[in-house]
Amino acid sequence: MNQQLSWRTIVGYSLGDVANNFAFAMGALFLLSYYTDVAGVGAAAAGTMLLLVRVFDAFADVFAGRVVDSVNTRWGKFRPFLLFGTAPLMIFSVLVFWVLTDWSHGSKVVYAYLTYMGLGLCYSLVNIPYGSLATAMTQQPQSRARLGAARGIAASLTFVCLAFLIGPSIKNSSPEEMVSVYHFWTIVLAIAGMVLYFICFKSTRENVVRIVAQPSLNISLQTLKRNRPLFMLCIGALCVLISTFAVSASSLFYVRYVLNDTGLFTVLVLVQNLVGTVASAPLVPGMVARIGKKNTFLIGALLGTCGYLLFFWVSVWSLPVALVALAIASIGQGVTMTVMWALEADTVEYGEYLTGVRIEGLTYSLFSFTRKCGQAIGGSIPAFILGLSGYIANQVQTPEVIMGIRTSIALVPCGFMLLAFVIIWFYPLTDKKFKEIVVEIDNRKKVQQQLISDITN
């Protein structure tokens, strides 16, 4: 439990999430708008596609988790995927923004499905081992909290940078001009992403000792089945991700049709990510040390709920107050997103404590499965609300559409953050219990190692 990690290792690990988000954040920020306003895919078709493919991605996570748990190489279980899986991922991150505008609508939809599914599968085969790697680097709670904070900051900075780089380029641009912008930036980001993944690979090591051999699929599933804290955390994560992606998918529509100024898109993303997540993530290790991971999550969820409720009421009549409300909500959301990674890592030890079986890959994949479902639901809710309210691309919108956009960006996230608070209120794995579990696991390993040594001698 004493594996203290250097800042070089922590920063190197976080660069992997920068690379992750070159593919991931582009989709969250721009893909729905690209499909509807540039590629000419209908809002309802785009929303359905985003929902179905992200559900496919969720199942791809489970497949990837099992693949990861079955691998053991001279580089470890997880690091090889960062080395060999990145090129296909980055290629698909370019292809999803390459819908040819002169195709028929049906051809565009088929191409969107195929390329987005390919992106999701490749992302799972890189992101699952990347996330699982944290559980193998250390069992020390503060170091795990720092890893979570570092990747949270890295992801948020990536969101902000992409918004500042690409947002102004598409401001007041025609659909034809936007095509060139998306093509240029996706290629640049793909090359940079491969470099950053390699740095992450070289900067990290797997330090947690494993004694038990790779378990069968049946034993692995039985281990998951008994892990009640993992299932509760997954449901809480589902709610937080629905909230997060409802905001991300609605932001461009909010600034374009409610505020009537796409130039404010970068400001909105800046407040949501830099002021929110980057401001909150450094606070999390200290909060964890003082009040524990569970209470840290609860404070974040409550702050997010109140912030989004205020944002809804002021989202039209006062932009400065609306930005303050969004900042409050984003700080709360940032706290929950950051501490979530440390909570997930703890559930690996809980499963090992109950059954003697350590399955980082499958545990993380189930956690990621529910996160992907949250992304799917949260990302598609705005599309469905737009369709139901009568949205027509690139036109002056009706009051019903404006209310739909406000609901998507504020009320939907408010409700799901409140639900996350209620669920984690009953979360059973406290920091005190976790420390007892790690001590027990270490004692078991010492006994097993001694038995192996005695038999060998």
UniProtKB/Swiss-Prot annotation:
One Pfam family, short name: MFS_2
GO biological process: carbohydrate transport; sodium ion transport; transmembrane transport
Coiled coil residues, start to end: none
UniProt main location, coarse: membrane
Membrane topology term: Multi-pass membrane protein
Any one GO CC term of the record: plasma membrane
Membrane is among the record's keywords: yes
Spans traversing the lipid bilayer: 12-34, 38-60, 80-100, 109-129, 147-167, 181-201, 229-249, 264-284, 297-316, 321-343, 373-393, 409-429
Keyword Transmembrane helix on entry: yes
GO MF entries: symporter activity
Protein's cellular compartments: Cell inner membrane
InterPro entries named among the record's database cross-references: MFS_2 (IPR039672), MFS_trans_sf (IPR036259), Na/Gal_symport (IPR001927), Na/Gal_symport_CS (IPR018043)
Keyword vocabulary terms for this entry: Cell inner membrane, Cell membrane, Membrane, Transmembrane, Transmembrane helix
Side Cytoplasmic, residues: 1-11, 61-79, 130-146, 202-228, 285-296, 344-372, 430-457
Ranges of the Periplasmic topological domain: 35-37, 101-108, 168-180, 250-263, 317-320, 394-408
Family the entry assigns: Belongs to the sodium:galactoside symporter (TC 2.A.2) family.
PANTHER family linked to this entry: 2,3-DIHYDROXYPROPANE-1-SULFONATE EXPORTER-RELATED, MAJOR FACILITATOR SUPERFAMILY DOMAIN-CONTAINING PROTEIN
Full protein name: Glucuronide carrier protein homolog
Native organism: Escherichia coli (strain K12)
Gene: uidB
